[in-house]
Amino acid sequence: MPHIVLLGDSIFDNAAYTGGGPDVVTQLRGQLPEDWRASLAAVDGAQAADVAAQVAGVDASATHLVLSVGGNDALLAAGLLDEPVYSSADALRLVAATVREFEARYRDAVAACLARRLPLVVCTIYHGNFPDADYRERAIVALTALNDVIVRTACAHGLDVIDLRAVCDLPQDYANPIEPSSIGGAKIARAVACVATGAGTPSARLFA
């Protein structure tokens, strides 16, 4: 029996933010064929460095892994968005240092998943729904650098990518500035089901 395990953070472990509505894993189960299973190993608040421990607890029956992590790593580095600098070069150095540290942690997370020798799908970090337009624009620029790490890592290993920036693209997809609502969760679940079962048609293809 095919068995999808969701790894990572509150993109999947979003029950606390749905106002009583279904969480992502519940909605995913409703999207899958009857003979498929879905389990939640993701933990709200998890960072890339926590993924290896999640993978270690994955049941032997798992046949597919889906990873969405990085948002909390980004939150920990959010202070750089307001860091005073003397030049654009200084600003870019701050971003580069953050990217370098995140890349090491993210590649380790993916390596831990790949060690299970199962099909793996990874997700980008979505833009969120920050109410302040100026902050939102700065956050998107910084997240682009982190998402580049995710896409390059996926390309290096021939992995499929779910671009959550395109999936959760409306205000109602969010329960707050950073967490998916049940509406957004349904869209995430649909994307996961389509990729895992092969039922979906990619909206774009990337060759590397």
Model-derived features with residue positions:
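Serine-esterase "nucleophile elbow" of acetyl-processing enzymes
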Residues: 1-46, 54-61
